[in-house]
Amino acid sequence: PVTGEWQTYTFKLSDLAGAGLDVSAIDVLMIFPAWGAGEGAVYRVDNVKIYNPNAAPVASGELNVFTDTVADQWSIWDCCGGSTPTTETDDDQHGAVAQFSIGATPTVMGFLADEGVSFDASALIENGVVQFDLKVITAPSNVDAQWLFKIESIGASSAVELALTQSNEGQTPVTGEWQTYTFPIGQLFDAGLDISAINVLMVFPTWDMGNGALYRIDNVIIANP
């Protein structure tokens, strides 16, 4: 460091892992002079991030939650079932997709933003949509289970839950077939969602009726179509 000048510093996660760091559970980052030799130091730090510099940029005002891979600062998520959703290879059109499997423990699944992270869709209220592709590989064993879409704002301060049949397409999932589902941002806002702080998107069978369900999701966007 040169006193009075900003300098960028970059460390590869692969190098840190090679040095012994568990990169799956990072919870502290520190920058400091040598122990016992820092008296008098005054310094500033900015633009601290853990990210993929090669990730495709997201268009301004829009969010690609999942296409081939999950967005930075988002994850594929199982609320309560204890499973780890995976990324699997599907057909040529879809490529890598998110896969979810529900067992006997009641749960909901989808995509979750990191702590304190959310997406502001306010600029999309007129024409924007939440859209995704769904393919059910194995239907739930309970034939009365209904497929649902749920979206929440940060801190679960507001949420909207709708049947997939309430989408623009109005289609019930057909096992083994991909189907696109579209929900207008304006519709979600009118239903009570705080669209300025979206941080959870979920697709799942009715609570406690999902045992046996195996399904895939791709092309999850919050955007102007």
Please name every model-derived segment:
Residues 1-225:
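Beta-rich carbohydrate-recognition modules and glycan-binding surfaces
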